[in-house]
Swiss-Prot record:
Protein name (Swiss-Prot/TrEMBL): Taurine import ATP-binding protein TauB
Species of origin: Pseudomonas fluorescens (strain ATCC BAA-477 / NRRL B-23932 / Pf-5)
Gene3D superfamilies: P-loop containing nucleotide triphosphate hydrolases (3.40.50.300)
Subunit-level organization: The complex is composed of two ATP-binding proteins (TauB), two transmembrane proteins (TauC) and a solute-binding protein (TauA).
Location of the protein in the cell: Cell inner membrane
Length: 264
């Protein structure tokens, strides 16, 4: 049964001649890791902003468990590419910040924050300052903070895009471990093709001008990793390589088509 439903969503910004998204329908169910991939201008971030409630669609409707999405909510936790951490707070304070705003008692919110830090392999980092953390550690703190409020859905906006290749792979593997342990549905957007194929249970490919879904793929590579298979074995699997090349070809064909349309 779908937890999150988007029905024929379109989005057009004020003053824009064309919509950024047109006629998008999708569902996100329990234990699903849905990844949106597409070239620049395909509306990936706009789609996530709609689901998060940061902006409203110009047409269609979005529902979470049958209730219309109207504005941001703790039920939809968001992890950004920019870690957006509070430099005046230590690690524990950052993870517990949303719970503090919600009025949760100090002992309970700090216990929950420590639990989430352990989940992302940062046990013992409570008193570290943000400036003392690496890029990957900052993203772990951001993930722990989003999970601390126990959201129904986790939304991730190119969360590993600013990391080096080695740290990015570590974070991908950590995400799959967290996803398996929490069983929370995840909606993630990325521009990295290998990342999309590795993580997704369901992959949607978006074409630009306006953003539309042009292909949907059901994949199991991330599930295989979560079940204990090594990332190296999965990524050397001929089926993984074939899928990655197929997706690469589709993305480049969309980019080429867009460039031809933009030529005078």
């Amino acid at each position: 049964m779908a937890l999150l439903q988007l029905e024929r969503i379109s989005a057009q910004y004020p003053g824009a001649a064309e919509p950024v998204l047109a006629d998008i329908s999708l569902t996100l169910g329990p234990q699903q890791l849905l990844v949106a991939l597409g070239p620049s201008g395909s509306g990936k971030t706009s789609l996530l902003n709609l689901i998060a409630g940061f902006v409203e669609p110009s047409a269609g409707r979005i529902q979470l468990d049958g209730v219309p999405v109207q504005g941001p909510s703790a039920e939809r936790g968001v992890v950004f590419q920019d870690d957006a951490l509070l430099p005046w707070q230590d690690v524990l304070g950052n993870v517990a910040f949303g719970l503090e705003l919600a009025g949760v008692a100090r002992d309970k919110r700090e216990a929950r924050a420590r639990e989430m830090l352990a989940l992302v392999d940062l046990a013992g980092f409570d008193k570290r300052r943000i400036w003392q953390l690496s890029g990957g550690q900052k993203q772990r703190v951001g993930l722990a903070r989003a999970l601390a409020a126990d959201p129904r859905v986790l939304l991730m906006d190119e969360p590993f895009g600013a990391l080096d290749a080695f740290t990015r792979e570590q974070m991908q593997e950590l995400l799959l471990q967290v996803w398996r342990r929490t069983a929370k549905p995840v909606f993630l957007i990325t521009h990295d093709i290998e990342e999309a194929v590795f993580l997704a249970t369901d992959l949607i490919l978006l074409a630009p001008n306006p953003g539309q879904i042009v292909e949907r793929l059901n994949l199991d590579f991330g599930q295989r990793y979560a079940a204990g298979e090594s990332a190296r074995a999965i990524k050397s699997d001929p089926r993984f390589i074939e899928t990655r090349e197929h997706v690469l070809a589709r993305v480049f064909s969309q980019r080429s088509a867009t460039q031809q349309q933009e030529r005078p």
